Amino acid sequence: MDLHQKIRTLPTSPGVYLYKNAEGEIIYVGKAKNLRSRVGSYFVRGADENSKTGSLLREAVDVEYIVVDNEKEALALENNLIKQKKPRFNILLRDDKTYPYIKLTMGEKWPRVYVTRRLKKDGSEYYGPFFPANLAYRVVDLIHRNFLVPSCYIDLRRYHPRPCLQHYIGRCLGPCVEGLTNEVQYGEAVKDVKLFLEGRHSDLKQSLTARMNKAAEGMQFELAAKYRDLITTVEDLHQKQRIAAAEGDDADVFGYHYENHMVAVNLFHMRGGKVLDRRDFFFEDLGEMEATGGLNTGEFFSTLLQQIYLDNKYVPRTIYVPVEFEDREALCEILSEQMHRKIDINVPQRGDKRSLIDLVAQNAKQSYDQRFRVMRPQTDVLKSVLQDTLELPELPNRIECFDISHIQGAETVASMVVWEDGKMKKSDYRKFIIKTVQGVDDFASMREVVTRRYKRIVEENQPMPSLVLIDGGVGQLHAAAGALEAIGITNQPLASIAKREEIIYVHGREDEPIRIDHHSPVLHIIQLIRDEAHRFAITFHRKRREIRDRSNELLEIPGIGEQAMKRLLRHFGSIQSIRTANATSLEAVVNRTQAEAILAHFRAEETTRS
């Protein structure tokens, strides 16, 4: 059953649909109130005029679907699948900053508090995010002073002979030394910290008051005084929060600017009626979000809000967005259930709130100009900045970048792409079939391709590039460096860019990784070169697999050996051309018996399909 036939059989229920390419890879995930209607809309006249949607339709060979009970379930499932599968044609959130959380290590006998920007499934409890960032550190300092739960990295699985300075100055209970505290006392302190971080001030005050009274009854007046002071501190903090809340509710406000197939989004975080921080998001590949008439703003903001807020630890009571979108009420319900309180997503049309959205949109335009106009400087300036950032001995007039591609060690290939004087120089691209490596060994594969490339350069007395760039981490970088040294090339500028973290390692300074600002044109150009090497390697690898698969199919035909297979592929170019060829065309390449066998094979295949 072909794709069009399959779409006509889709149910009219709500659900999620998944487009797949020839390799079975999920390339787009979408949600729908009516699966048949939504998926069918891709194929109406004019739908593929948009280059992005057209690319999706040209690559998609299959569609799968998951039926759910309602729109709310479809929205949640779509978000989970996008985060899990990261489909190429969906917009994927790439934030330019991460906010700190406070981590309470409940998996330890003696839990501690830390400020962290990474959320892990390690049994710890996380509170936040906090912005501005220094607020998290101020809260932890308050915990040290009032609850005496530490942030140290001492091994608490064993006792030590003496406590550190923090215990002596009254900022730690001293669980590292036997006898200074016990599990009951420490457990009460941790419970207090949890109540404090969860904002349960009444429960915390009640617990502290009970302990204060008990201490007073036991004639422990110094301890009772400590509890009294702590109760006063908790009341003061609670009062300040109530005043801030009265001055203005917590809210997030969105604005955007769309131009030339690119979008800048600004998000203002308002807490207590004041703007405490802002975030920028930039999108250059909008995929299915960009319809023929421009940006599908409703679907864009629906997806954006899902990726920002679903599964987040904190969602403000009100979110203001500039446009209406279809599943706004469903998203409100999900977020309200997630936070155990009512969450509103509003689309103001007039008044102060609309003026606020317009203000955020003006900031988004400035961010757009800064990112897409100002920060795309002239080539010479860019090369100079790149030279300074990586501390290169000369201007990087030519960069050669390598990437390895395989699936579980099969059909391993490599690519080399070239950036020269501000442009990708496709005429100098090279493809390599890895010959000496068996199985999965990216390091050995990198050594082979670098050796082959630059051994030839040396033999032909050609100049080396200004920079050799490797797609990978420190391991791949060392493999490339070892290959160059083995053929007598020293002092060659060499760097690598690690995936996901986008950290740059320079050979000889691996212990000083370079973290470049996300808005920097230097990072953009390195990412562009790296992504092009990856694309080129993936494309070559797919073609190799297709050739292998075609070869296997032809070799299954009785009487067709390797020589006949090679002649057929060389003459017709593709399996599809062979499949549609007539007897006369086939007999120009193979004998009559072989031609008849080929015709019979594809005739039987067609009968099976129908």
Curated annotation (Swiss-Prot):
Subunit structure, interactors included: Interacts with UvrB in an incision complex.
Role noted for this protein: The UvrABC repair system catalyzes the recognition and processing of DNA lesions. UvrC both incises the 5' and 3' sides of the lesion. The N-terminal half is responsible for the 3' incision and the C-terminal half is responsible for the 5' incision.
Coarse class of the protein's main subcellular location: cytoplasm
Keyword match Amino-acid biosynthesis: no
Keyword Coiled coil in annotation: no
CDD domains per the UniProt record, alphabetical: GIY-YIG_UvrC_Cho
PROSITE patterns assigned to the protein according to its UniProt record, in alphabetical order: GIY_YIG, UVR, UVRC
The gene coding this protein: uvrC
Superkingdom of the source species: Bacteria
Location relative to the cell: Cytoplasm
Pfam families: GIY-YIG (PF01541), HHH_5 (PF14520), UVR (PF02151), UvrC_RNaseH (PF22920), UvrC_RNaseH_dom (PF08459)
Annotated transmembrane regions: none
One GO term (biological process): SOS response
Keyword annotations from UniProtKB, A to Z: Cytoplasm, DNA damage, DNA excision, DNA repair, Excision nuclease, SOS response
Protein name as annotated: UvrABC system protein C
Record's GO cellular component terms: cytoplasm; excinuclease repair complex
Recorded family membership: Belongs to the UvrC family.
Residue stretches making up the UVR domain: 202-237
Ranges of residues in domain GIY-YIG: 12-91
One GO molecular-function entry: DNA binding
